[in-house]
Amino acid sequence: MNAKAAQSLFGAIASSKKAPTREEPAVNFKSTNESLIKKNLQLKQQLSQCTKALEKLRNENIALREQNQELIDATLDEKMERIVEQRVKSRLAHAAVLHKKLVQNIQQTGLELGGIFKDMEPEPSGMVTRRAPKMECNLEKLDESPVRNFPRSDYEEENKSPMDIQNGPSSSSSMTQNLENGTPRMAQRASKGRRSELFHSLHENVPEEAAPAVGYKRAPLLIAPSETPGGPPKKAPPRKAPTPRFKKPSTPAPAPISDDAEMPSTVRRQRSAKMNIKSMKEPSVNSKLRRPGKHDEPMPFIDTFF
């Protein structure tokens, strides 16, 4: 190898190993290291969660195998009981989830309604509202008006009770004192009430006024002239009696019976309706027949008579 060729070869290798130029961006190793550390932690957490889930699934698999073996070894009644128990548990779990959701919805709607009612409340006004004070009536008390004084003799005679008759003048003196004071006070055992006595006496004292005599004049009687100058009007022809709409059907007279002795006592006499029968055809058995009476012939299938 020539010296010049060797120098040119080693010079090309050295030029390729030179430092980077300013145009290439510098790498931040600290930030990349932190991001890698965070990713490593996340992967570790995922790994722990996966291991826990795997352990849980293994335990469930073991429990299911045991239950399957128990079902295989158990009798028919035990199998039915286990199936019913599992279904009841699943239904109860489903009902618990629904109840939880329902409670959450009710609470949410209650909060929404509370907010709506708060928005609808009127704003407080600046006016001060007070209760009006109670007005007391300060009117003067009036004494009871005295009742009209009646003649003492009539009042005493009407309102005398058997107790007053026995007491004598003491009761009359007390009555006069009450009349002088104003309102008469009757005895406790009065025969009539105070109000009835007052109205009775007022009706008696009303004077009767005579009604003034009024003369009535009778108006003269006027006769209207007849329409036609001729004689009296002709009489209308008498009405005919109304013919009845429905005529009562007449039944034919019964045929005369020649000899009663010829007919036996057990046979019933012929009726007048038999005259209308044009043929001797027997009645149909489908329709209802007449119940036999005591004068009919004895029936062949009946032992007793009616």
Swiss-Prot record:
Which residues fall in a coiled-coil region?
28-75
Q: Does the keyword Ribonucleoprotein apply?
A: no
Q: Which residues cross the membrane?
A: none
Q: Main localization of the protein?
A: nucleus
Biased composition of type Basic and acidic residues is found at 133-161
Q: Which Gene Ontology CC terms are recorded? A: condensed chromosome, centromeric region; nucleus
According to the record, the residues making up region (Disordered) are 122-196, 223-306
Per UniProt, the keywords (alphabetical) are:
Cell cycle, Cell division, Centromere, Chromosome, Chromosome partition, Coiled coil, Nucleus
Ranges of Polar residues compositional bias? 167-181
One of the GO biological process terms: cell division
Q: Per the record, where are the segments of Pro residues compositional bias?
A: 230-241
Q: Which InterPro entries match?
A: Shugoshin_C, Shugoshin_N
Q: Which domain of life is it from?
A: Eukaryota
Subcellular compartments? Nucleus; Chromosome, Centromere
Summary of the function given for this chain in its UniProt record: Plays a central role in chromosome cohesion during cell division by preventing premature dissociation of cohesin complex from centromeres after prophase, when most of cohesin complex dissociates from chromosomes arms.
Q: Which family does it belong to?
A: Belongs to the shugoshin family.
Protein known as: Shugoshin
